[in-house]
Structures are given as structure tokens and as C-alpha cells.
Design a protein with these regions (language model features):
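Generic preference for hydrophobic
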Residues: 334, 397-399, 454
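Nucleotide 5′-phosphate-binding alpha/beta core
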Residues: 1-140, 147-233, 241-278, 283-306, ...
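Conserved helix-loop-beta element of the AMP-binding
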Residues: 324-346
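Short, structured coil segments at secondary-structure junctions
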Residues: 238-239, 330, 364, 393
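Conserved ATP-binding/catalytic segment of the ANL
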Residues: 418-475
């Protein structure tokens, strides 16, 4: 396992962090410099991946990519990899609980080296726990087929995954008025006068000062290494009080077993506990959270509510069904992300959900924000009041046509590709399963750089993530 990125990569990453902070504080940055740094990082990562990751080395060999200094355009043309790589293992390995085999697969797709001890796990949940103790963090997701994706992160990449977004999301949230103007000014001064790593350390130590006025209500699980669950768990650390809809970890064994069927009594017991929490006790969990939310409201405390669209929809419907007069304190906010499918599998109209949140909770429109991300990347794209997802400057985004050829232009639609300079332990040159429209123009909100206007799953790609899974469970 590579302990540290090489010097060229580290220099590029440090430069991109500074640009992220500048973009957060001023809404603009030197886009040409950012692209130069992204190219430097991509070239350095290309060499590391080719030397350390067998799967990527094979891709390079098949593409005839044998040089040591490819440009960004060459990498885009020859080295982009579908995100299906993270579920490319034989499904029989999990069916047979062959975790030695799963470890061998991980070592082919990532720059990691799981121990023999981790391969002796009894089940999938224990396997993830044992790997975590070795400094290997598997973040999982699942489509509606039940085929699990596992993204392997070493300690460096894990730190980037958890912390990089903190370089710009607090400031972008402040721009929408979520925190008081004096805190926004203080945050802006810190962004302009501190090195990024020092700013992250300060956020770790004193982040609760920003959100200490808020009680947090999280419409997800209190544990588990699934993408949106981790976002909620991290945000909860900064709130004065945190309440989770499901006070239990999200078990990958349960998620897979519900869709594909249990293979052992132990697995069935985990599935039964999961269904009890999410289906049988669903109303009780909603009532418990709403009762706590009502108390916060009566005490005059602001609230942050976080979750996926379908769960927020049901929370709002419960408020109306119980005829609660919830008018949360001014400054309360709702953040959401994840799949836009409801429990019956239909798409939830975004405008309808935003209006319902305002009606049932009294949240002002500019305090309702959405984020777009995915399990495989180190970063988050926040949607602005103009309904655009702004792409932070460390990401190189590529729009691909049906033949996976890059499309040029300032307003293009196609399959989204992302080159992530902070993916150190696995290939970060990824073709996603999302079909998007990307524009490059000054946004009316004042923020510069490229932005995504619309998002859908690419043709033939299954619904992915917690939203799609829960929709299937509850259908």
C-alpha cells in the first residue's frame, strides 16, 4: 500500500485545495490554473495507478498507453473506467462468504493489501469491520439488483472523502443565509487568511461553533459505510443535538440479503431486524423524530433536517397527517441528497417537494438545499438558489456521447465522467452511470465555473443508492 502520494501529486492537491477555498469565499477562481493542477494530478495518479493497480495496468496495456507523461486529453480518451469496476467481482464470492477471494479482488482494483485475517470474516458486515481496523475503508452502495459496489479507500483517500467538502460547503451554505452574517464574515476571513489544511484542522476542533445553534434531525441511519449515511453522520458531529430516524447502523449484509435472498439463518436474522426498523416500526420512528422536532420548535431552537427526498416527503406527509403546526425557527434549514424515487418507484417532482417542505415545516425556500455526489468521489456539488449544481474546481468533468467519446462545448448533455485528483487508492478516472446536462457560464447566483443543470440515470443503468433500495423494499 502506498503510504503517501508522490511529490507532484501532493503539490497539485495542495494547490487545488487553495483554489477550492478561494472559490468558496469569492465565488470565483482561476479556472485555467485549476485545470493545469488537475492535469498535473491526473498525470501523477496515472503513473501510480499503472504501477500499483493491476486492473488499471491492464486497461493501459489494452489501450497502448505505455508512456509516463500522458496529457489530460489522452487520459480522458484512453483511461476512463466505468464505475462498474467496483462490483466486478463474481457474485458467488459473497454468496459463498469467500472473503479471501474478495480480498484478492480488492487488491486487483485498488492500491491496498488486505490481510489474511480479514479474509476469515464470518459475514460481510464483519469483513468490512476487519478491513476498517487495517485502515481500509470500504464505502458501499447497491443498485436495485442487490449487486454491491465496494469502493476501497486507504487512510489518505478516506480523509479526503470525509473532509475535502468542508473546504467549501460551509461557505456556500453561508451564502444562502443558513448561518448568521457575522459568522459568515468570520468564516470568509478565515478562508482568505488560512492554509487549507489549517482550516480543516480548525473545522475539526471548532466546527460545532458554526452549527451550535442547531439541533440536527437526520432521516437516515446512525451508522454504516454507505455514502449518504456517512454525510449525515459527519454533519451530526457539528450539531448541538443529533437525532436519527433509524438509531441503528445500515448493514450491507441486510441490504443485499433483502434483494437477493438470505443464504444463512444469521443473514435472515439481520434482514428481519432491518425490516423491523425500516418497515414495521416506520411510523413509530417518524413519530419519535417529529416529537423531538416539535420540542425543538417550542424551545425556539433552530433545526437542520437532512435526508433523502423520499424520506423527507414522508416526514412532511406525516406532519400534515398529524396536523402538527410546525413552524421551525427562522434560519432552520433542510439539506437533502440521494435518489429522487419514492417508495412506489415514481419520481418525486423537485418543485413539489420543496413546496411541501415549506408548507409543512415553515422552511423558507432559500434555506432548502440539495447536494449531488456519489460513493466513488471525494467531493459534493451543492445546488444554488438558481437550481444549478456547482462543480467544485478540483473535479475535471467530462461529458461523453453514447459511444463514450468526449463532447466539447459550453452546454452539453451526455454521460458524466469525473477525474478525481484525490482518489489515491483506486482509479479515479471514472465514467458514472448518470446522464447530465453541464453548462459553463456565469450563474445568476454569482458563482463561476461549470455547473450541472439536470441529472438522470443513463439508459440501461439501474437505480443506485439508498433511495432506490428503500423504494424497492417498500414497494
Amino acid at each position: 500500500m502506498t503510504a503517501f502520494p508522490d511529490q507532484a501529486l501532493k503539490q497539485a492537491q495542495d494547490g487545488l485545495k487553495k483554489i477550492m477555498v478561494q472559490w468558496a469565499a469569492t465565488k470565483t477562481c482561476d479556472q485555467d490554473k485549476a485545470r493545469t493542477l488537475r492535469e498535473q494530478a491526473a498525470s501523477a495518479n496515472y503513473l501510480r495507478y499503472r504501477r500499483s493497480i493491476p486492473y488499471f495496468a491492464k486497461v493501459c496495456s489494452m489501450a497502448g498507453m505505455n508512456g509516463d507523461s500522458p496529457g489530460l486529453d489522452q487520459i480522458i480518451e484512453h483511461c476512463m473506467i466505468p464505475d462498474d469496476i467496483f462490483k466486478s467481482y463474481p457474485q458467488g464470492l459473497l454468496d459463498d462468504r469467500d472473503f479471501q477471494g474478495m480480498n484478492r479482488w480488492l487488491a486487483k482494483v485498488g492500491d491496498i493489501g488486505p490481510s489474511q485475517a480479514a479474509g476469515k470474516a464470518r459475514n460481510m458486515d464483519q469483513w468490512l469491520d476487519l478491513l476498517k481496523k487495517e485502515g481500509i475503508h470500504l464505502v458501499f452502495s447497491s443498485g436495485t439488483s442487490g449487486n454491491m459496489s465496494f469502493v476501497p479507500r486507504d487512510e489518505n483517500t478516506w480523509r479526503h472523502f470525509l473532509k475535502n467538502s468542508l473546504l467549501y460547503t460551509p461557505m456556500t451554505a453561508a451564502d444562502q443565509g443558513v448561518i448568521p452574517s457575522w459568522k459568515k464574515l468570520a468564516l470568509k476571513l478565515l478562508c482568505q487568511n488560512m492554509e487549507p489544511d489549517a482550516l480543516l484542522s480548525l473545522t475539526d476542533r471548532y466546527g460545532r461553533l458554526i452549527f451550535r445553534d442547531f439541533d440536527g434531525y437526520f432521516c437516515n441511519f446512525s451508522g454504516g459505510a454507505q455514502g449518504i449515511q456517512l454525510v449525515g453522520q459527519e454533519l451530526a458531529k457539528y450539531c448541538r443535538n443529533a437525532f436519527f430516524l433509524y438509531d441503528a447502523p445500515l448493514s450491507p449484509m441486510a441490504v443485499r440479503g433483502i434483494i437477493r435472498g438470505a443464504t444463512a439463518p444469521e443473514e435472515q436474522a439481520v434482514i428481519d431486524a432491518f425490516l423491523k426498523t425500516t418497515v414495521h416500526d416506520k411510523k413509530a420512528n417518524y413519530h419519535r423524530m417529529l416529537n423531538a422536532l416539535e420540542k425543538s420548535s417550542k424551545r425556539g431552537r433552530k433545526a437542520i433536517i437532512f435526508g433523502t427526498p423520499y424520506l423527507l416527503l414522508e416526514i412532511c406527509q406525516e406532519v400534515k397527517a398529524r396536523k402538527l403546526n410546525l413552524r421551525l425557527k427562522k434560519g432552520s434549514a433542510v439539506f437533502f441528497g440521494g435518489g429522487w424515487k419514492s417508495f412506489d418507484g415514481n419520481r418525486i417532482p423537485e418543485e413539489e417537494l420543496v413546496e411541501l417542505i415549506g408548507e409543512s415545516l415553515g422552511i423558507e425556500r432559500n434555506f432548502i438545499a440539495e447536494g449531488y455526489s456519489m460513493t466513488e468521489i471525494q467531493g459534493l456539488m451543492l445546488r444554488c438558489p438558481e437550481w444549478r449544481y456547482h462543480i467544485p474546481p478540483h473535479f475535471e468533468t467530462v461529458i461523453l456521447d453514447p459511444e463514450l467519446r468526449p463532447l466539447g462545448g459550453d452546454d452539453v448533455t451526455g454521460t458524466l465522467g469525473i477525474i478525481d485528483p484525490f482518489a489515491e487508492s483506486y482509479p479515479g478516472f471514472l465514467i458514472t452511470g448518470d446522464h447530465v446536462r453541464r453548462v459553463k457560464e456565469q450563474c445568476p447566483c454569482g458563482r463561476g465555473g461549470p455547473a450541472i443543470i439536470s441529472i438522470a440515470r443513463s439508459p440501461g443503468r439501474e437505480v443506485k443508492g439508498c433511495g432506490g433500495i428503500m423504494a424497492k423494499i417498500n414497494a
